[in-house]
Amino acid sequence: FFIKLILFFNFCDIMLYYNNSHEQNEVNQVKKKTLVPLITFLLGICLISLIVYKTDTHEKEQRHITAQLNVANYGERIKNEITNGIEITDTLKQILISEDGEIHQFETIAGNLMSDSIESVQLAPNGVVTDIYPANGNEAGKIDLIHDKDRGKISCYARDNHTIITQGPFKLKQGEYGIAVRNPVYLKDKNGHEYFWGFTIVILRVPDIFSDSISALSNFGYEYKISKTDAPWSDTYKVVYQSDGQINHPVSYTFTIGDENWEFEITPKSGWRNATLLIIIIGMFLTISLLLSVLTRVWLVAKEHKKKFQILARTDSLTNIYNRYGFDEFAEKMIQKNPKAHFVA
């Protein structure tokens, strides 16, 4: 009787321990089903952040490299386009030198030098504009450059420093803008002494003079700005022409014409960040991360259900006590653990 009683209490202790362990197991399983998918998702977010950061850095570097190449290439083209306009003044200068300060048939020569980007060609002996082509509508341009309030200082600088100067932009009568290029001319008298003859002048239309370059850049998706120093002695830049959009953190190219510095700046219209690519990457990897989290939870739930079915196969559904199959399995495990012990069932 005592042996049976001891066995009964031992069995009850075992079942109580089992029930407590089972309840604790269920709590742990609930935590596991929540935490593991959450950790999987958070790790996915960390991985996405790293991928996005690396991609963003690489894209910005590539866009900067491409922009640097474009700004240097088209900056040089703009310089050449402006220089081509300035060459008209050099042509007139050479004629004046060869003809000892005289130009015969000025209108014919100037007409042959004209192009769509040239507003007018002028001669200014002793700094006073006397000849303009085309003459019609440009009568007001016949002024004394040396003593003019707005043009005198920079014209004297060109004369005294033997350098080409550009002034502007200023508004033209047609509503467009122009830049005046003044090229000082020096001749020699009978004694071989050099003296100032005057200026050969060309008025360049803005933006016509560099329309090919800015049109190409606009098609490539860039905002742009062209600036020049306000005067040869100044460090202040004045905008010559710019696109309608905003210029943010531009790359730039500088060049010199005469004694004046020019600056050409560009920036992508869509910005330095490739937002479309980043959205695609975030969307794709976020979807993968969510799917992995869901699949992890599904796997954990399936695993838990499998364990529950295994428990149901071994225990009574009402009492949660081992049934015959479960008891036999449990007894077999106990015997295997303690092969030298004696058990009564």
Q: Which ranges hold each PLM region?
A:
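N-terminal signal-anchor/signal peptide hydrophobic helix marking the start
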Residues: 30-43
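Extracytoplasmic/periplasmic sensory segments of membrane signal-transduction proteins
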Residues: 70, 81-146
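Cytoplasm-proximal transmembrane signaling helix
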Residues: 273-312
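Conserved nucleotide-binding and Mg2+-coordinating catalytic segments in signaling enzymes
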Residues: 310-329
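Active-site-proximal structural segments of metal-dependent nucleotidyl cyclase/transferase enzymes
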Residues: 328-345
